Amino acid sequence: QHPTVQKMIDSFIEQYKGQADFDITLEAQPDSTTRDVLLGDVQNGADVFSFPDDQLSAMVAGGALAPVPNVQEVKDKMVAESVAAATVGDTLYAYPMTADNGYFLYYNKDYFTEDDVKTLDSILAVCEENGKKLSMELNSGWYMYSFFGNTGLSMNINEDGITNSCDWNTVDGDIKGLDVAEAIVNVISSPGFVSQPDGEWVAKAADGEVIAAVSGVWQAVAVKNIWGDDYGACKLPTYTCNGRQIQMASFTGYKMVGVNYYSKNKDWAFKLAQWLTNEQNQTLRFVEQNQGPSNKVAAASEEVAKVPAIAAVIEQSQYGVLQRIG
């Protein structure tokens, strides 16, 4: 993403030239470690930084984020779910940047029809018949949630913002945790299923072993290169649990741009954060990085709708929830 972001910075400097002398340094930082790096030395941290929504609570608790000043403008321009993801209590703490950080089903259309991918049972049956695999990183809690999320069972962060509550071991209700566990055992017992790290299945797709996988948009370019015109993507299927079909859930995810509470140039930092997330640059990010926009206008474009992975993550989002775990 480095060259893309640098283009945005260059256009920002051009837009505001003559109004200030800019010295903007772009440093690469994995999203997964932004929180830890910033909170480790927040007073000397970056003025402007991007991060995924599941780090927001910790950032706010650590006093790292300056509240967004132009809240109504952001609400008017961004999809509501992305604004909610950047909000704690009644305070908006960051500018939404992307709306695609969830997961869905990739599949090879050479093997599956649109009806085949509606249920996990039929997906596994096709895999078994062809000696192929459905891949999913089942030892990851992020993906494991998909089996529990739409069962009436819950897992949430408590009001303290640190501890969690979870009732997956309940003995009450139509669907119990044991029912879900038994359903998962049935899935992994299929010779058509393989659990492996998300980063490994693409290589297995390239050698023909994997023909379907639960993953996210970050693999879209690689999958398109491997499967070509047979590249398909859609919402997650239903699965069999306690004699019924249950729609698999997901964690939805959003990325955003925040401003350091301790920035010595806060006004300009807010201008840059807003610039990096405006319609123009969300469109640029989509074109060059295939990342789904949170800006309403950019997200509604025909070009976005034509990308199977983006369309799939949007379709799946109605069955997902924000990841809010301590």
Where are these regions (language model features)?
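Conserved N-terminal structural module of periplasmic/extracytoplasmic solute-binding proteins
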Residues: 1-55
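Short helix-initiation/N-cap motifs at beta->coil->alpha
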Residues: 27-37, 120, 193-206
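A structural signal for short loop-to-beta-strand junctions that line the ligand-binding cleft
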Residues: 39-40, 44-47, 75-107, 132-136, ...
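Hinge/lid segment of periplasmic solute-binding proteins
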Residues: 53-103, 115, 121, 232-236, ...
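Extracytoplasmic/periplasmic solute-binding protein
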Residues: 91-97, 103, 122-169, 210
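Glycine-centered hinge/linker elements that transmit conformational signals in sensory
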Residues: 163-197
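Extracytoplasmic/periplasmic substrate-recognition and gating elements
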Residues: 225-289
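C-terminal capping/gating helix-and-loop segments adjacent to ligand/active sites or protein-protein/ligand interfaces
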Residues: 251, 288-292, 309-326
